[in-house]
Protein backbone atom coordinates (compact mmCIF):
# COMPACT_ATOMS: atom_id res chain seq x y z
CA UNK A 1 0.00 0.00 0.00
CA UNK A 2 0.94 3.65 -0.38
CA UNK A 3 0.07 6.12 2.40
CA UNK A 4 0.04 9.83 1.59
CA UNK A 5 -1.44 12.08 4.24
CA UNK A 6 -4.88 10.68 5.04
CA UNK A 7 -5.04 8.62 1.85
CA UNK A 8 -4.31 4.87 1.76
CA UNK A 9 -3.96 3.49 -1.75
CA UNK A 10 -3.37 -0.22 -2.50
CA UNK A 11 -0.61 -0.77 -5.08
CA UNK A 12 -1.47 -4.39 -5.89
CA UNK A 13 -3.59 -3.45 -8.94
CA UNK A 14 -0.45 -1.97 -10.54
CA UNK A 15 1.74 -5.09 -10.05
CA UNK A 16 1.00 -6.59 -13.49
CA UNK A 17 1.64 -3.28 -15.23
CA UNK A 18 5.00 -2.93 -13.50
CA UNK A 19 6.08 -6.51 -14.33
CA UNK A 20 5.02 -6.09 -17.95
CA UNK A 21 7.04 -2.90 -18.27
CA UNK A 22 10.10 -4.50 -16.67
CA UNK A 23 9.92 -7.56 -18.93
CA UNK A 24 9.68 -5.79 -22.27
CA UNK A 25 11.69 -2.65 -21.59
CA UNK A 26 15.17 -2.27 -23.23
CA UNK A 27 16.33 -0.48 -20.09
CA UNK A 28 16.71 -3.62 -17.99
CA UNK A 29 18.72 -2.09 -15.19
CA UNK A 30 16.93 1.14 -14.59
CA UNK A 31 13.38 0.24 -15.61
CA UNK A 32 12.19 -1.04 -12.21
CA UNK A 33 13.16 2.23 -10.60
CA UNK A 34 11.74 4.28 -13.48
CA UNK A 35 8.50 2.25 -13.49
CA UNK A 36 8.13 2.73 -9.77
CA UNK A 37 8.68 6.48 -10.16
CA UNK A 38 6.09 6.74 -12.93
CA UNK A 39 3.60 4.66 -10.96
CA UNK A 40 4.17 6.73 -7.82
CA UNK A 41 3.77 9.97 -9.78
CA UNK A 42 0.58 8.65 -11.37
CA UNK A 43 -0.88 7.70 -7.99
CA UNK A 44 0.04 11.02 -6.41
CA UNK A 45 -1.64 12.82 -9.30
CA UNK A 46 -4.82 10.77 -8.83
CA UNK A 47 -4.89 11.51 -5.11
CA UNK A 48 -4.25 15.19 -5.72
CA UNK A 49 -7.09 15.36 -8.25
CA UNK A 50 -9.40 13.54 -5.87
CA UNK A 51 -8.66 15.90 -2.98
CA UNK A 52 -8.98 18.93 -5.22
CA UNK A 53 -12.33 17.67 -6.49
CA UNK A 54 -13.59 17.15 -2.95
CA UNK A 55 -12.52 20.66 -1.96
CA UNK A 56 -14.17 22.20 -4.99
CA UNK A 57 -17.32 20.13 -4.38
CA UNK A 58 -17.56 21.21 -0.75
CA UNK A 59 -16.98 24.84 -1.68
CA UNK A 60 -19.64 24.60 -4.37
CA UNK A 61 -22.17 23.20 -1.90
CA UNK A 62 -21.37 25.93 0.62
CA UNK A 63 -21.74 28.63 -2.02
CA UNK A 64 -25.04 27.12 -3.15
CA UNK A 65 -26.33 27.03 0.43
CA UNK A 66 -25.36 30.66 0.92
CA UNK A 67 -27.07 31.63 -2.30
CA UNK A 68 -30.28 29.79 -1.41
CA UNK A 69 -30.50 30.98 2.20
CA UNK A 70 -33.42 33.26 1.49
CA UNK A 71 -36.05 33.87 4.14
CA UNK A 72 -38.49 30.98 4.54
CA UNK A 73 -41.82 31.96 6.08
CA UNK A 74 -43.52 29.77 8.65
CA UNK A 75 -46.29 28.78 6.24
CA UNK A 76 -43.73 27.28 3.86
CA UNK A 77 -42.23 25.07 6.58
CA UNK A 78 -45.12 22.63 6.42
CA UNK A 79 -43.07 19.72 7.72
CA UNK A 80 -43.16 21.46 11.10
CA UNK A 81 -46.94 21.63 11.37
CA UNK A 82 -48.73 19.50 8.76
CA UNK A 83 -49.00 16.55 11.18
CA UNK A 84 -50.83 18.81 13.64
CA UNK A 85 -53.54 19.37 11.03
CA UNK A 86 -54.23 15.76 10.07
CA UNK A 87 -57.60 14.23 11.03
CA UNK A 88 -58.79 17.55 12.50
CA UNK A 89 -61.26 20.26 11.61
CA UNK A 90 -59.20 23.37 10.96
CA UNK A 91 -60.25 27.00 11.01
CA UNK A 92 -57.78 29.42 9.47
CA UNK A 93 -57.35 33.15 10.05
CA UNK A 94 -55.83 34.59 6.89
CA UNK A 95 -56.25 36.93 3.95
CA UNK A 96 -54.64 37.59 0.56
CA UNK A 97 -51.18 37.75 2.19
CA UNK A 98 -51.31 34.11 3.29
CA UNK A 99 -49.36 32.73 0.36
CA UNK A 100 -46.64 30.11 0.09
CA UNK A 101 -43.91 29.50 -2.46
CA UNK A 102 -44.61 26.44 -4.58
CA UNK A 103 -42.01 24.03 -5.96
CA UNK A 104 -42.04 25.76 -9.35
CA UNK A 105 -41.24 29.10 -7.74
CA UNK A 106 -44.70 30.61 -8.14
CA UNK A 107 -46.86 31.66 -5.19
CA UNK A 108 -50.17 30.06 -4.24
CA UNK A 109 -52.54 30.69 -1.38
CA UNK A 110 -52.04 28.65 1.78
CA UNK A 111 -55.71 27.63 1.80
CA UNK A 112 -55.45 26.20 -1.72
CA UNK A 113 -52.24 24.39 -0.77
CA UNK A 114 -53.73 22.81 2.35
CA UNK A 115 -56.90 21.76 0.54
CA UNK A 116 -54.75 20.09 -2.10
CA UNK A 117 -53.00 18.21 0.71
CA UNK A 118 -56.40 16.95 1.94
CA UNK A 119 -56.41 19.08 5.09
CA UNK A 120 -59.96 19.54 6.38
CA UNK A 121 -60.61 23.29 6.55
CA UNK A 122 -64.04 23.99 7.99
CA UNK A 123 -64.02 27.80 7.76
CA UNK A 124 -61.96 30.92 7.21
CA UNK A 125 -61.93 33.76 9.73
CA UNK A 126 -61.52 37.02 7.81
CA UNK A 127 -59.78 40.06 9.39
CA UNK A 128 -60.06 43.70 8.33
CA UNK A 129 -60.11 44.04 4.51
CA UNK A 130 -61.61 40.53 4.17
CA UNK A 131 -60.28 37.15 3.10
CA UNK A 132 -59.42 38.30 -0.43
CA UNK A 133 -58.36 41.81 0.64
CA UNK A 134 -61.17 43.49 -1.29
CA UNK A 135 -62.64 45.63 1.53
CA UNK A 136 -61.43 49.16 2.22
CA UNK A 137 -59.83 50.22 5.49
CA UNK A 138 -62.50 50.41 8.19
CA UNK A 139 -65.14 48.85 5.93
CA UNK A 140 -67.35 46.25 7.61
CA UNK A 141 -66.53 42.74 6.41
CA UNK A 142 -69.54 40.47 6.04
CA UNK A 143 -69.89 36.74 6.53
CA UNK A 144 -70.23 34.76 3.35
CA UNK A 145 -68.88 31.99 1.19
CA UNK A 146 -65.68 32.08 -0.83
CA UNK A 147 -66.56 31.61 -4.49
CA UNK A 148 -63.28 29.90 -5.36
CA UNK A 149 -63.07 27.31 -2.57
CA UNK A 150 -66.67 27.18 -1.34
CA UNK A 151 -65.46 27.66 2.24
CA UNK A 152 -67.52 29.57 4.80
CA UNK A 153 -66.12 33.02 5.56
CA UNK A 154 -66.65 34.26 9.11
CA UNK A 155 -65.94 37.95 9.59
CA UNK A 156 -63.80 39.17 12.48
CA UNK A 157 -64.30 42.76 11.39
CA UNK A 158 -68.06 43.09 11.51
CA UNK A 159 -70.60 42.45 14.24
CA UNK A 160 -67.92 40.73 16.32
CA UNK A 161 -64.14 40.97 16.38
CA UNK A 162 -63.64 38.01 18.68
CA UNK A 163 -64.68 34.52 17.54
CA UNK A 164 -67.73 33.37 19.47
CA UNK A 165 -68.10 29.97 21.11
CA UNK A 166 -70.66 29.11 18.45
CA UNK A 167 -68.28 30.07 15.63
CA UNK A 168 -65.59 27.85 17.15
CA UNK A 169 -67.92 24.91 17.68
CA UNK A 170 -66.51 21.78 16.05
CA UNK A 171 -63.11 23.40 15.41
CA UNK A 172 -60.15 21.33 16.62
CA UNK A 173 -57.36 23.81 15.81
CA UNK A 174 -57.00 27.38 14.58
CA UNK A 175 -54.25 28.27 12.13
CA UNK A 176 -53.21 31.94 12.00
CA UNK A 177 -51.35 33.32 8.97
CA UNK A 178 -51.37 37.08 8.38
CA UNK A 179 -48.63 39.35 7.08
CA UNK A 180 -48.32 42.31 9.43
CA UNK A 181 -46.28 45.52 9.12
CA UNK A 182 -45.20 45.92 12.73
CA UNK A 183 -47.18 49.06 13.53
CA UNK A 184 -49.47 49.19 16.58
CA UNK A 185 -52.55 50.68 14.92
CA UNK A 186 -52.75 47.95 12.26
CA UNK A 187 -55.54 45.69 13.46
CA UNK A 188 -54.07 42.26 12.74
CA UNK A 189 -52.36 42.07 16.14
CA UNK A 190 -55.71 42.91 17.76
CA UNK A 191 -57.33 40.12 15.76
CA UNK A 192 -54.52 37.85 16.94
CA UNK A 193 -55.28 38.82 20.54
CA UNK A 194 -58.97 38.01 20.26
CA UNK A 195 -58.37 34.74 18.41
CA UNK A 196 -55.93 33.58 21.08
CA UNK A 197 -58.32 34.65 23.83
CA UNK A 198 -61.34 32.89 22.32
CA UNK A 199 -59.33 29.72 21.68
CA UNK A 200 -57.95 29.75 25.23
CA UNK A 201 -61.50 29.97 26.58
CA UNK A 202 -62.63 27.06 24.39
CA UNK A 203 -59.44 25.01 24.93
CA UNK A 204 -58.56 25.04 21.23
CA UNK A 205 -54.88 25.13 20.22
CA UNK A 206 -53.55 27.92 18.02
CA UNK A 207 -50.70 27.68 15.52
CA UNK A 208 -49.21 30.98 14.33
CA UNK A 209 -47.25 30.80 11.09
CA UNK A 210 -44.61 33.48 11.47
CA UNK A 211 -43.86 36.06 8.80
CA UNK A 212 -41.22 38.80 8.67
CA UNK A 213 -41.85 42.25 10.05
CA UNK A 214 -40.54 44.73 7.45
CA UNK A 215 -40.02 47.23 10.29
CA UNK A 216 -38.42 44.85 12.77
CA UNK A 217 -35.02 46.56 12.70
CA UNK A 218 -36.10 49.45 14.94
CA UNK A 219 -38.51 50.49 17.70
CA UNK A 220 -40.08 53.93 17.73
CA UNK A 221 -42.94 55.99 19.12
CA UNK A 222 -44.75 56.38 22.41
CA UNK A 223 -46.06 53.43 24.40
CA UNK A 224 -49.87 53.21 24.42
CA UNK A 225 -51.48 54.24 27.71
CA UNK A 226 -54.25 51.89 29.00
CA UNK A 227 -56.79 54.73 29.04
CA UNK A 228 -56.63 54.91 25.24
CA UNK A 229 -57.01 51.18 24.58
CA UNK A 230 -59.11 50.26 21.53
CA UNK A 231 -59.15 47.82 18.62
CA UNK A 232 -56.52 49.96 16.87
CA UNK A 233 -54.31 49.77 19.94
CA UNK A 234 -54.86 47.10 22.57
CA UNK A 235 -51.45 46.67 24.19
CA UNK A 236 -48.88 48.87 25.96
CA UNK A 237 -46.35 48.79 23.13
CA UNK A 238 -44.64 51.52 21.04
CA UNK A 239 -46.09 52.61 17.71
CA UNK A 240 -43.36 50.63 15.93
CA UNK A 241 -42.75 47.60 18.14
CA UNK A 242 -40.06 45.66 16.25
CA UNK A 243 -41.47 42.13 16.53
CA UNK A 244 -42.74 39.51 14.12
CA UNK A 245 -46.34 38.33 14.41
CA UNK A 246 -45.15 35.08 15.99
CA UNK A 247 -43.04 36.89 18.55
CA UNK A 248 -45.98 39.16 19.29
CA UNK A 249 -48.22 36.15 19.95
CA UNK A 250 -45.67 34.83 22.43
CA UNK A 251 -45.58 38.23 24.13
CA UNK A 252 -49.38 38.27 24.45
CA UNK A 253 -49.18 34.94 26.24
CA UNK A 254 -46.11 35.81 28.29
CA UNK A 255 -47.45 39.17 29.48
CA UNK A 256 -50.86 37.59 30.24
CA UNK A 257 -52.72 40.24 28.29
CA UNK A 258 -55.66 37.94 27.56
CA UNK A 259 -58.82 38.38 29.59
CA UNK A 260 -58.63 36.94 33.12
CA UNK A 261 -54.96 36.17 32.56
CA UNK A 262 -55.63 33.04 30.50
CA UNK A 263 -52.97 31.79 28.11
CA UNK A 264 -53.52 30.17 24.75
CA UNK A 265 -52.23 26.73 23.80
CA UNK A 266 -49.84 28.34 21.35
CA UNK A 267 -47.37 26.99 18.82
CA UNK A 268 -45.34 29.31 16.61
CA UNK A 269 -43.78 28.03 13.40
CA UNK A 270 -40.66 30.19 13.14
CA UNK A 271 -39.01 31.79 10.15
CA UNK A 272 -35.83 30.35 8.69
CA UNK A 273 -32.79 32.46 7.72
CA UNK A 274 -34.26 35.60 9.26
CA UNK A 275 -33.07 38.20 11.75
CA UNK A 276 -34.54 41.59 12.59
CA UNK A 277 -31.92 43.13 10.28
CA UNK A 278 -32.83 40.94 7.30
CA UNK A 279 -34.15 42.86 4.30
CA UNK A 280 -37.36 41.34 3.00
CA UNK A 281 -39.60 42.14 0.05
CA UNK A 282 -43.19 40.99 0.21
CA UNK A 283 -43.90 38.39 -2.47
CA UNK A 284 -46.78 38.58 -4.90
CA UNK A 285 -49.10 35.75 -5.89
CA UNK A 286 -48.77 34.72 -9.53
What are these language model-derived features?
Residues 70-119:
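N-terminal phosphate-binding or glycine-rich loops at protein starts, especially the Walker A/P-loop
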Residues 180-192:
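Glycine/threonine-rich flexible loop motifs
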Residues 229-286:
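Conserved anion/nucleotide-ligand pocket segment
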Residues 141-170, 183:
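Glycine-rich oxoanion-binding loops at beta->alpha junctions
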Residues 1, 10-13, 17-67:
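Bacterial Sec-dependent N-terminal signal peptides
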Residues 120-128:
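Short internal beta-strands
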Residues 119, 201-205:
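A short helix->loop->beta-strand "cap" motif at the edges of active sites that frequently abuts
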Amino acid sequence: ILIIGEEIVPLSPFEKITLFAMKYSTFKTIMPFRSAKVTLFFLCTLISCKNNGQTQGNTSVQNTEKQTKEVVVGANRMYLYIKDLRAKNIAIVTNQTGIVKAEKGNYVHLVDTLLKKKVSISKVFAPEHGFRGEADAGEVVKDGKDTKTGLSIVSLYGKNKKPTAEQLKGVDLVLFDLQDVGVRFYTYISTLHYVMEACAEQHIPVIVLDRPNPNAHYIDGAVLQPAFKSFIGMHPVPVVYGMTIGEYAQMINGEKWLQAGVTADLKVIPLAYYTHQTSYSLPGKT
